[in-house]
């Protein structure tokens, strides 16, 4: 028997995707979702590991990637491979299947000239050895809207809200999203077709809640924001106690955002607002009367891997002037290993090979974690994951790598 990693062929998609679904528990996806991902999957960027036994073949490993552009500090949108659909059959664990796929995939990403690879991890412990570092975090909350009050900024009352069928206002909502992308690191410039993810609404995924609802915000005649949500009714001895389940919210200005949040707090017959996957620096946290009754929690979200260290570090800007030499360790992508001089500021940067002595020593995993500005190099240094060679270099680089806006991945892939 032989195992062969190779690029997926269109006629193999059903077998390949079936292997993926089985690895994630085997629960069939709703037909609408299945067909959308069939359309979105880039077959030429997808890999399967196939075991051949005589004339028979079976798929025992899957991975793929989407060709994204991701915002980085400074506002540039950098090419990034969105790694997805990673699985290994339970019958073939610890046989090198995952390593062979990651090897082929990162070689391909390099050949395509994409300086970054990014992913969301079902099991975070897996991906560090391949050079991925946790670069963004997301905020969840369970807000007791019967007890928590919201203090809103000036102009909030000028915002007009209207219900709309989600499909009818999809283009307007997508236009709002597109305007927000350059302003926050980690956001993805969506290709055509991706906006349809927001409309997926199978009954099996509602957990007792209503079909998807949408409210659109207008200010001065312009659509300035939207909220997509569901309502899960509940009744007890004291009356109604339903939950608003937020799916997505976006606003072009603070007043629009506040108006949308205030609306969600005030939905009739509800006393709770469930929030998932929001930016960790979102303003509502500082507008509430009692943050403890919001039960905020943070968790890891996007993992970043620098495939081309020089191109990736030169593609972003830096909050403060930085001139440091990194000694980079990268056993899995050895073309990155060695010394790199990064010189940059708020206007731009360069990153080139150098023979000069190192100022900081770290692995490519730490560079990935710090890349979007959400994880401080100084924190990684305190954890023993960055070694300072030149005194003061760690503080200099840590300040430079920072971002005023927390990086955020708005949706999975």
From Swiss-Prot:
Residue ranges annotated for the N-acetyltransferase domain, each copy included: 3-155
Gene Ontology biological-process annotations: aminoglycoside antibiotic catabolic process
Annotated family: Belongs to the acetyltransferase Eis family.
Sequence positions that bind acetyl-CoA: 86-88, 94-99, 122-123
Summary of subunit composition and partner proteins: Homohexamer; trimer of dimers.
Entry EC number(s): 2.3.1.-
Pfam family, one: SCP2_2
Keywords linked to the UniProt accession: Acyltransferase, Transferase
EC class: transferase
Organism from which the protein derives: Streptomyces coelicolor (strain ATCC BAA-471 / A3(2) / M145)
Keyword Zinc: no
Disulphide-bridged cysteine pairs: none
GO MF, any single term: aminoglycoside N-acetyltransferase activity
Active site residues according to the UniProt entry: 127, 413
Annotated protein name in UniProt: Uncharacterized N-acetyltransferase SCO2625
SUPFAM superfamilies to which the protein is assigned, alphabetical: Acyl-CoA N-acyltransferases (Nat), SCP-like
